[in-house]
Amino acid sequence: LPYTITMDPTAVLNIIYKTAVLIKKTVEDVKANQQQCKRLGERIDAINQCLKSLNDRDLKRSEIKQSLDNFRKCVQECLDFITQFKEKTSWFVRVFKNQNHKEQFQELNLQLSQCANDLNLGIN
C-alpha cells in the first residue's frame, strides 16, 4: 500500500508560486523556444491569479488539495522542461529535437488546461 504524504495546501500554493517565479526568471535566459516557454509561464501565471482567490475553506476540500498537488507537479515539469533551453546547443541538435519539443510543449499545455479545469471545478 503506497504511503503518500499530503502537504498542507498553503505550503503547496507557496511551492507553486515560487516555482512560477523561477519559471519567469528562467524564461528570460532561454536560448531556444522563447515564445513557447513564455506562453507556458503566462498560462501558469493566469492560473495562479485564480488560485489567489481561494480561501481557507476552499483549501481544506479534498478535491482542491488533489488538484493543487497535480498543478504543483505540472508546474515543476514545466520548469524542468524550460530549463533545458538555457543551454546553447548546435543548430543541428535543435532542429533534430524540435519536433519532440513541439510535442512536449503541447503535452504540457494540455496538462495545464486539465489542471485549470480541475481547479475550476473544485472551486465552483
Predicted regions: what they are:
Residues 1-63, 91-98, 102, 107, ...:
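N-terminal amphipathic alpha-helical segments
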